[in-house]
Amino acid sequence: MGMTMAYGAADEAGGIATIKRAHDLGVTLLDTAELYGNGTGSNEKLVGEAVAGFRDDMVLATKFGFVLPRGSDPNRQLDSRPDRIREVAENSLRYLGTDHIDVLYQHRVDPDVPIEDVAGAVKELIDAGKVRYFGLSEAGPDDIRRAYAVQPVSVLQTEYSIFERAVEKEILPTTRELGIGFVAYSPLGRGFLTSQVKPASEYGPDDMRSFDERWQPGNYEQNVAAIERLTELAQQKGTSVTQLALAWLLAQGDDIVPIPGTRSPDRLAENVGAADVTLTADDLKLVDEILPGGSFGSRYAEANMPSWERG
């Protein structure tokens, strides 16, 4: 996502180089979405161009589910009607330059379209050979079960990190019961868990951290204090706080796959190195003591919070 939106100006050439470097380092899963190109397909096109020489080595995941803003309208609305799903899938196939999508996610649950209809539309695409696996993003336990009854859900993608642990209560028990893999997005707390952070006021208006509650005065200082303690633990382990955060996720179970985003080849190599970091039971206990309930400040404004988390 961050290669074309949400974190300031994009650098297409740099993005392609980073993806190619990821392949060299053994990364096999790339995550994109219709939304990340704001209707232009730019993110999917970037991914498609980058992997053209090694497409068969990669698992390409993309998403449908939004009506994208037009003209001066900044608002995004949900749209998971079956006709729209088919339209987005065809666009994604073209943008990615591939004959199949490995994982097709519903980006957000659409309250106006029964989840059974969504699952049925994706099932048709799977039966046609255009999609291989069905995924959901930020879906609650009930929606997961209802969708699964129509078309088995292979993977759920939801925010999960040392900072955000709400999924541990009901979501992970549900996916584990059904044998669904879990992809953790924002595993580095949108960059907070890299220790390279600054207050919200120092980010530009096109950077989502400028309005993220965790960067706002009061919350920011408490989160920085927690990062300082995590950094001390990382130093004791001979690693970085970034690798510590990713290793923590990997330690939560073999079903957890974090997808850290980066534009930097150096950061990419650091992220991959987290697979070599082993955390002890005492290390995990200390992390729980430092941030027992996750970060200070909500991950989204109330209006944008997924329905399962709003209650």
Q: For each of these PLM feature ranges, what is it?
A:
Residues 1-58, 307:
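N-terminal binding-site loop/beta-alpha segment at the start of enzyme catalytic domains
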Residues 7-14, 42, 46, 76-84, ...:
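Alpha-helix N-cap and loop-to-helix initiation/capping positions
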Residues 167-205, 240:
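Aromatic-lined glycan-binding groove of carbohydrate-active enzymes
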Residues 15, 30, 47, 60, ...:
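Conserved, mostly hydrophobic/aromatic
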Residues 205-236, 251, 255-256, 265, ...:
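Terminal-tail/helix-coil boundary detector
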Residues 20, 70-166, 170, 181:
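Glycine/proline-rich, positively charged
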Residues 1-3, 33-35, 63-67, 106-109, ...:
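Active-site beta-loop-alpha junctions enriched in small/polar residues
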Residues 4-6, 67-74, 267-270:
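A short acidic, helix-capping loop that chelates divalent metal ions and anchors anionic groups
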